[in-house]
Amino acid sequence: ILDGAIHGCLLFRPLPRHLDEAAVCAALSPVKDVDGITSGSLASVFSGDGQGYPPCTAQACLELLDYYGFEPTGRRAVGVGRSLVIGRPAAMLLLNRNATVTLCHTRTADLAAECRRAELLIAAAGRAGIIGANCLSPGQVVIDVGINVDAAGHLVGDVDFAAAEAVVGAVTPVPGGVGAVTTSVLARHVLDAAAKSADISL
């Protein structure tokens, strides 16, 4: 995408069936990949070299931790969910901040025990209520990235919020939690991309 008037592009997936996702991603310049979906952007997240932009939601998790003064260094973090959109990038961003990270998923043996050991728990499995009371420990920080619709048609996260609120040190709600921060991260990425394009220092 060579149009100099465009500074950032978002790719909403799944794409229509007639479009080749790999070809679309290959056509997207890393400098305009403001949501970290291309292989080049993800490689920079995994290598920790600071080039490109990480996926906005994964970075939003770190922004929340920074805002509330939670320092990841030396902390035991558990991520539930292994997608390239949230789970894996969030794990890499935490590793780059010196956390000790365990990445779990819906087929992890004894998921509850893994979760209970965490000081920081990021739920991004895409399964409503997968993180229940049996997964939680006092004092934990829990970031719920899940977006699901329950049987009553309500928007809910991956975490049983009522159970978490009674036990953990802090938990993000759904809706009204990570999503708002994700939007702010996206806006910052676009602004940064525009500034780089114009050779302006922010």
Residue ranges of model-derived segments:
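Residue-level signal for alpha-helix termini/capping positions
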Residues: 1-2, 66, 195
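Anion-binding alpha/beta catalytic cores of soluble intermediary-metabolism enzymes, centered on
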Residues: 8-72
